[in-house]
UniProtKB/Swiss-Prot annotation:
Its job: Lectin involved in the quality control of the secretory pathway. As a member of the endoplasmic reticulum-associated degradation lumenal (ERAD-L) surveillance system, targets misfolded endoplasmic reticulum lumenal glycoproteins for degradation.
Gene name of this polypeptide: yos9
Protein name, as recorded: Protein OS-9 homolog
Segment forming the signal sequence: 1-40
GO biological process: endoplasmic reticulum unfolded protein response; retrograde protein transport, ER to cytosol
Chain positions recorded as a mannooligosaccharide derivative binding sites: 139, 151, 209, 215, 237, 243
Organism: Schizosaccharomyces pombe (strain 972 / ATCC 24843) (Fission yeast)
SUPFAM superfamilies: Mannose 6-phosphate receptor domain
Length: 310
């Protein structure tokens, strides 16, 4: 089945109107109306800002079951296809080959990395007076720029308004990045689908009972949302007493290299109704024309179709 974390919003036909139109609905609502195709696993969708982005379309063009093999043979290598079922109905869906798209994307644009490092850390310095705190169930995490990252459990004290942090662990302390040499040594620049992020490591945390080594946390600073407020967007213990944390820095969004690429056009997922034989009750074009149209790189335009009001 689809996962709400994989498809937070899909563009789908509206229901209960005289015409089919496209609209954006929360997945929790549209999930009742979508057949169980496992496109989430096929497309490896992670979040709303993942690349490539997708839009979903129902086509009013029906295809003959006997034409499917021919369509598959003619489909561009940048596209994949699958058959799916919803009750008694069969659908043929054409969707992008996400692996090829990512392989062909520019993951490391040409930038002056040292200049990018300087510009980026200047924006991160704006967190100097910011205290970030994130509660994740039993544990709470906080980040203080230039100082540390901590993990602790907040325990209310009986008969008092005070809350005790017990236990508390320092996951890592900030390195010295004041000199140019330290700046280069302690700040790494990475790219994910052409978007830059800065990364550093806070070391010398509380000693770990399991590894017998000090805890450490890898911090990634990026423009990860459209929010004007800095926030901890991701946290994970990747191995015993080794952690990763991602922090959204609004200032980085003003730098082109770090900015979310919202203007990237979405890749289409188009599904067609499959029929056993030609019928006057459906909109079915000349068989060979349909084969060529469905197999082409750009799926056919979805038209407005008159429907009965429910």
């Amino acid at each position: 089945m689809f996962s709400s974390s994989m498809f937070p919003h899909l563009i789908l036909p509206a229901i209960g109107s005289s015409k089919v139109r496209t609209m954006v609905l929360p997945f929790a609502f549209v999930g009742f109306f979508i057949f169980p195709i496992c496109l989430a696993s096929l497309l490896d969708w992670n979040d709303a800002y993942e690349y490539p982005k997708y839009s979903f379309e129902w086509s009013n063009v029906s295809i003959l079951e006997g034409d499917i093999d021919s369509i598959k043979e003619k489909t561009e290598k940048t596209k994949l296809s699958s058959l799916f079922y919803a009750g008694k109905h069969e659908y043929f869906c054409v969707y992008p080959n996400a692996s090829l798209i990512k392989q062909n994307s520019t993951t490391e644009p040409s930038y002056d990395l040292q200049e990018l490092r300087i510009q980026g850390t200047e924006k991160i310095n704006e967190l100097a007076n910011v205290f970030l705190i994130e509660n994740r169930g039993y544990w709470t995490y906080d980040y203080v720029y230039g100082q540390h990252v901590r993990q602790y459990h907040l325990e209310p004290q009986q008969g008092s308004d005070k809350v005790l942090a017990n236990p508390m662990y320092i996951l890592g302390t900030a390195p010295n990045t004041q000199t140019k040499k330290n700046l280069e040594e302690n700040w790494a620049i990475g790219f994910v689908e052409g978007k830059a992020y800065l990364q550093t490591t806070f070391r010398n945390g509380t000693m770990c009972d399991i590894t017998k080594r000090p805890r450490h946390v890898i911090l990634s600073y990026e423009c990860s949302t459209n929010s004007d407020t800095p926030e901890i967007t991701q946290y994970q213990e990747v191995s015993s007493c080794a952690y990763s944390m991602t922090i959204h820095v609004p200032g980085l969004c003003s730098l082109p290299a770090f900015k979310i690429q919202e203007d990237i056009p979405s890749e289409k997922i188009v599904c067609y109704n499959v029929i056993k034989e030609k019928s006057n009750e459906v909109d079915h074009k000349d068989s060979q024309h349909v084969v060529d149209e469905v197999a082409q790189t750009s799926p056919p335009e979805v038209k407005e179709v008159e429907t009965q009001s429910s």
